[in-house]
């Protein structure tokens, strides 16, 4: 992510609710802004998460995209520590539900996405990178070459990594569990 965007995201992490409201009103065109009724059910903490999410996507998409209601509902739920299930069809924007928390989290945080298909991993990696998030897919096609891991010392590699995609069966091998709770 370029330093200007990173600086902007860092600033919004520290904005007060009043500053978030003002910035949202001044930045997001009224025709793209979510209806007032959507925001009314949220208390201050969750409202701040939602506004911050809108501003993060607006900035990283080149001022083109504002998350829709289901994406914000999912983000607010995730960022509030709740278990979250998003059940919408192909092409509706589930990937953005994974991208937004990465943008809102502190720099250096790591997200792990378990993805069942290598092609889906490839598409999602490209989408994450489009928003400036350093991403890598690790699956059975990743070389099992010790030299690869010497190039990226494990600790540094994971600190630089924002999102890691891996196949469900690799998750089971590494963690010895099905991944479900």
Tell where the protein language model's regions lie, with residue ranges.
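N-terminal helicase ATP-binding lobe
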Residues: 1-181
């Amino acid at each position: 992510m370029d330093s200007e965007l990173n600086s902007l995201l860092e600033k919004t992490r520290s904005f007060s609710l009043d500053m978030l409201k003002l910035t949202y009103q001044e930045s997001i065109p009224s025709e793209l802004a979510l209806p007032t009724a959507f925001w009314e059910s949220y208390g201050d903490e969750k409202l701040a998460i939602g506004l911050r999410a809108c501003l993060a996507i607006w900035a990283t998409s080149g001022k083109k995209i504002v998350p829709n209601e289901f994406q914000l509902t999912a983000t607010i739920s995730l960022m509030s520590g709740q278990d979250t299930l998003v059940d919408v069809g192909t092409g509706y924007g589930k990937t953005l539900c994974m991208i937004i928390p990465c943008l809102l989290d502190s720099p250096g945080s790591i997200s792990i996405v378990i993805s069942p298909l290598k092609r889906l991993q490839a598409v999602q990696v490209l989408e994450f990178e489009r928003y400036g998030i350093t991403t890598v897919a690790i699956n059975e096609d990743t070389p099992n070459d010790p030299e690869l891991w010497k190039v990226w010392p494990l600790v540094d590699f994971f600190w630089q990594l924002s999102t890691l995609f891996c196949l469900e069966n690799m998750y089971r091998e590494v963690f010895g569990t099905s991944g479900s709770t």
